[in-house]
């Protein structure tokens, strides 16, 4: 396979594209992260999500420390070619570094952000570094 498919993507000025990870079984949005060309290429090659960490300025294989990897089921590109949707099988049921299933665990209710999702596992038990 050539890399021509990567040229279709409308990358941002800094060479990134947002990637939404969605649970393939129940459709729940798990997280949003960023990918550059190399991250997306490695994701396709490995079959597991690899993102670009904007804060650390390096590739990040999701679950490399926690074991909570994301097995890719499908990758979709939106109509404007500037957002990816990853259909994933979330290993361990935890996508968020807070120990929750989803990074979207707060909901706006009556002008307040309310936590609506429990911690599945304490992050101190997940991340030992």
Swiss-Prot record:
Catalytic function, reaction form: 1-(5-phospho-beta-D-ribosyl)-5'-AMP + H2O = 1-(5-phospho-beta-D-ribosyl)-5-[(5-phospho-beta-D-ribosylamino)methylideneamino]imidazole-4-carboxamide
Organism superkingdom: Bacteria
Keyword NADP: no
GO biological process: L-histidine biosynthetic process
Residues where Mg(2+) binds: 78, 80, 82
EC number, UniProt record: 3.5.4.19
Keywords: Amino-acid biosynthesis, Cytoplasm, Histidine biosynthesis, Hydrolase, Magnesium, Metal-binding, Zinc
Pfam families: PRA-CH
GO molecular function, one term: magnesium ion binding
InterPro entries per UniProt: PRA-CH, PRib_AMP_CycHydrolase_dom, PRib_AMP_CycHydrolase_sf
Cofactor binding remark: Binds 1 Mg(2+) ion per subunit. Binds 1 zinc ion per subunit.
Residue numbers binding Zn(2+): 79, 96, 103
Cofactor: Mg(2+); Zn(2+)
EC category name: hydrolase
GO cellular component: cytoplasm
Xref: PANTHER family: HISTIDINE BIOSYNTHESIS BIFUNCTIONAL PROTEIN (PTHR42945), HISTIDINE BIOSYNTHESIS BIFUNCTIONAL PROTEIN HIS7 (PTHR42945:SF1)
Family named by the database record: Belongs to the PRA-CH family.
Protein task: Catalyzes the hydrolysis of the adenine ring of phosphoribosyl-AMP.
Subunit note: Homodimer.
NCBIfam families in the record: PRK00051.1
Protein's UniProt name: Phosphoribosyl-AMP cyclohydrolase
Annotated organism of origin: Nitrosomonas europaea (strain ATCC 19718 / CIP 103999 / KCTC 2705 / NBRC 14298)
Gene designation per UniProt: hisI
